[in-house]
């Protein structure tokens, strides 16, 4: 069905535009590697519910903003930041990679942890 009213002005209902362009690849800022001990970032200890045991347990709480490349947090633990909280299960460890990301690994995966710290993974 269509209708043409020659006396009426043209009205555009929808317009879609797609643009493609090239940009320079961003240079990502990396941190210097520090000792694995995260104790300077520890805020407190708090009772936290542990899903594996279905019980509350007192675990260390770390300030995620104070953690740096190379820090290693053994589970169970909590990492808190302004916008998120990360639970590290007792079956996992967490490391901070060179870009500041928190990477969780099953305990015993030392080769993967070291590969991540060296930037190979």
Write out the residue ranges for each language-model feature.
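C-terminal, non-catalytic interaction/recognition modules in large multi-subunit enzymes and RNPs
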Residues: 1-121
């Amino acid at each position: 069905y269509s209708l043409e009213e020659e006396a009426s002005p043209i009205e555009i209902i929808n317009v879609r535009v797609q643009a493609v362009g090239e940009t320079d690849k961003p240079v990502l800022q990396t941190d210097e590697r520090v000792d694995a001990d995260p104790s300077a970032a520890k805020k407190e200890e708090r009772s936290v519910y542990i899903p594996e045991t279905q019980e509350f347990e007192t675990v260390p709480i770390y300030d995620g903003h104070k953690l740096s490349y190379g820090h290693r947090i053994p589970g169970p633990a909590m990492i808190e930041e302004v916008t998120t909280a990360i639970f590290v299960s007792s079956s996992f460890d967490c490391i901070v990679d060179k870009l500041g990301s928190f990477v969780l690994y099953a305990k015993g995966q030392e080769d993967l942890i070291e590969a991540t710290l060296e930037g190979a993974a």
